[in-house]
Amino acid sequence: MKDVEDIHRPMLNSLQSTSAKMKKIVLSVNAGSSSVKISAYSALFGQAPIQLAEAQISGLTAPPPTLRYTRHGEKVINDEEVKDQKVSTQADAFDILVKALIDDNGVPEISSKEDIAYICHRIVHGGDFVRPKLISDETYHNLEKLNDLAPLHNSTSLVIVHRCMSDMPKTTFNIACFDSQFHHTIPEHIRTYPINQDIARNNHLRKYGFHGISYAFITRATAEFLGKKVEDVNIIALHLGSGASACAIKGGKSLDNSMGLTPLAGLPGATRSGSVDPSLVFHYASDVGKLSPASTKDLHISRAEEILNKQSGWKALTGTTNFGTITAALDPSSSDTTSHLSPEEVAKMRLAFDIFVERICAYIGSYYVSLQGQVDALVFAGGIGEKSDRLRAAVIEQVSCLGFGPVDKEANETRVKEELDDSHDVIEIAPPNSKKGGKDGREHRVLVCKTDEQFEMARACAEDGEFWR
């Protein structure tokens, strides 16, 4: 006798086939400590999503909060102060953004919450999850446990996940997309820390790697630009922003990432120290093992975590988190805002810039050896990677001995600004070098990629048959 599933299988297959042909609305959500960003897409199963609108509220930790709203690539609201509405948490910001989307007559596809089929949440630390995960109550509780590994990173996202699970229609599926999942291919000898392995396993202590959603996008965009299959691409990718990392990608898969157990390891950032001698923090302050005043009942943050994550980086060196201010100070003629700086202040800016360049180049050299010189491209991405032509030029000059560069000045300074937009994901800023590396003689290209984590999450959802129901 056939079981119920066998009897209804043709009907289930027919329903799934019909569902695959229907356009659905996918919402990508990226929650940070001071901002929340959502992007709405129309998608068919197995096809690239089409963006309908994008909205962001910034300034949650530095009021007043401001709203930015874009429809079909055109700015509708540009950093307008949010008034007459409570905005004290990420969940509050999310509610306002969804309402703005629903109230926009220019996006008729979304007239109510019921029109949203999927919500993709960027979760920084996914532990041992190796692919996006449909969020059930059990999954949510597992993600809560990961807060111990990433209290400063996962908690903001889970606030919105909880709001969606309680307030959005039951027909809306919540999907967790993890920044760490791209790096599950890092080999054991690279991801393992040389500590007692029984303790390491019991406490999940190993390198995880992060910025993986961005690196997945960068890898696909670079492969398309080079006219290669993803599985044939070897690149050294740099995601450079207020949080920065480097990644060695071999055959389209992560071989190594500069971040580790948490995003703190590796490159310095706006407020992160990056990798330092582990004993440094114990000499820095006497209370590093105590809980930070920023801790709450459910969120335990040590003073050490607070110092190295929130009170370090180039802010500690210069007093600013804005890398653009640092680079402008090195070329006073380019900005009136830095002309008042004293020679001592300019020297601090120079030190921060030089430290960042040196650390980046150290990873490029290390990863070049890991890839045995078989590197298709060095790829810059992230806010700083996309915007700072001075940084790109300095890095390329220092790694020119490996066969990268020389920089095309016009491409680096002008074309990137003018052409790197939604229609151009990748711009080449140095011609293929005649010096070829590795046993297979690959040409070393230098590229700038406009990464898009929001799109990457929506794409992953649209291509996964498990979610498309």
From Swiss-Prot:
Keywords for this protein: ATP-binding, Kinase, Magnesium, Metal-binding, Nucleotide-binding, Transferase
Site (Transition state stabilizer): 211, 272
Binding site for ATP: 37, 239-243
Leading EC class: transferase
Superkingdom per UniProt: Eukaryota
Catalytic residues in the record: 179 (proton donor/acceptor)
GO molecular-function term, one example from the UniProt record: ATP binding
Pathway(s) served: Metabolic intermediate biosynthesis; acetyl-CoA biosynthesis; acetyl-CoA from acetate: step 1/2
Catalytic function, reaction form: acetate + ATP = acetyl phosphate + ADP
GO BP annotations, alphabetical order: acetate metabolic process; acetyl-CoA biosynthetic process
EC number: 2.7.2.1
Identification of the protein by name: Probable acetate kinase
Organism name: Neurospora crassa (strain ATCC 24698 / 74-OR23-1A / CBS 708.71 / DSM 1257 / FGSC 987)
